[in-house]
């Protein structure tokens, strides 16, 4: 088996046999293998591979005359490979990949399962995340895609990826054991979840993620996860909003200095405080006047009836309110904001074309068996303490994803690995920490 040098490296200069990314535009990239004697052609020009050997990664390479084009030669990364790989299936992009990697807790030296290799976009990212000491076990049921992916992984030097041709929904994950995380990109992930439980580690908290484009798939997946003992089930959709930067014209000062902006903010805060004090003062004066009017109304007037007193009250109230009305322009002097002299400049605008919905990501956590048994025992005891004279509706199997409201899972989640090991070794069923 011919395994080439690793695809992901930190070398400075381009060498023969390297895989490089030719960057033409943000949505136009091509991956090539540097082979002496060959030439890359595109609408911008021609680029002999011999001309690229020895150049620094990131260099701007111009096409020989008469073509005026140029390309940037970039060092490959999983992110760039995702944007330039040959599509054999629908692939995952960086927003989903990064979120899945974070939620699964993929770490250096870890062991993860990927079911549904496809074009290998997720596989390359997982390979980099686990590092040389970790392992990615990837499964693909389609024979032709499996063979193509196997050759690709070998040529890219992904020695920590173990690819197998297997239908995991029917045959399971084989001898895979001690796995910390599982990612299922399958049409029917609920058929593979029972097999995934057998491959997960039983002594630590493990996680699973299911990638499904339709809500009907999500509902079936959630039902299966609950039946298999998973907790903290949640579903998210990751959307990205692309913005384009607008370059201001040259030799212009559209942006103010930091000192001027800081000075403006300080003056604004000072005016806001003065306005607040003025409002407090005005409110106190109004309350004092209202109390004075009420006190005058309470004094009995000789020879006058109460109805006559009420008829005269509007004229008195109007004369009292005239003074604040006349003095309002004076108080408004502190309320008036000075005109904003800062120029308004557009520096960014939303891209006219952006990717929309890809799929729904359903995550769940599987606690160690001893923890789950203690949680079930505590739930049972709490049910026994519940008064029996309350008539409850029969429980139904709901497919709505919800979150635990109890404090037990929160306590377990707050444990460190050492506290978790000590608690499990003690054999205690009490979760009071």
From Swiss-Prot:
**From start to end residue, where is composition biased (Basic and acidic residues)?**
394-409
Q: What is its EC number?
A: 2.1.1.220
Q: Which InterPro entries match?
A: SAM-dependent_MTases_sf, TRM61_C, tRNA_MeTrfase_Gcd14
* Alphabetic keyword roster: Methyltransferase, Nucleus, S-adenosyl-L-methionine, Transferase, tRNA processing
| One Pfam family from the record | GCD14
- Identify the SUPFAM superfamilies for this entry: S-adenosyl-L-methionine-dependent methyltransferases (SSF53335)
Q: Which reaction does it catalyse?
A: adenosine(58) in tRNA + S-adenosyl-L-methionine = N(1)-methyladenosine(58) in tRNA + S-adenosyl-L-homocysteine + H(+)
* BP-aspect Gene Ontology terms: tRNA methylation
Compartment annotation: Nucleus
> TM segments?
none
User: Is Hydrolase one of the keywords UniProt gives this record?
Assistant: no
Q: Cite the PANTHER family for this sequence.
A: TRNA (ADENINE(58)-N(1))-METHYLTRANSFERASE (PTHR12133), TRNA (ADENINE(58)-N(1))-METHYLTRANSFERASE CATALYTIC SUBUNIT TRMT61A (PTHR12133:SF2)
Family per similarity comment = Belongs to the class I-like SAM-binding methyltransferase superfamily. TRM61 family.
Subunit = Heterotetramer; composed of two copies of TRM6 and two copies of TRM61.
Know the name of this protein?
Answer: tRNA (adenine(58)-N(1))-methyltransferase catalytic subunit TRM61
Q: Please give the organism.
A: Cryptococcus neoformans var. neoformans serotype D (strain JEC21 / ATCC MYA-565)
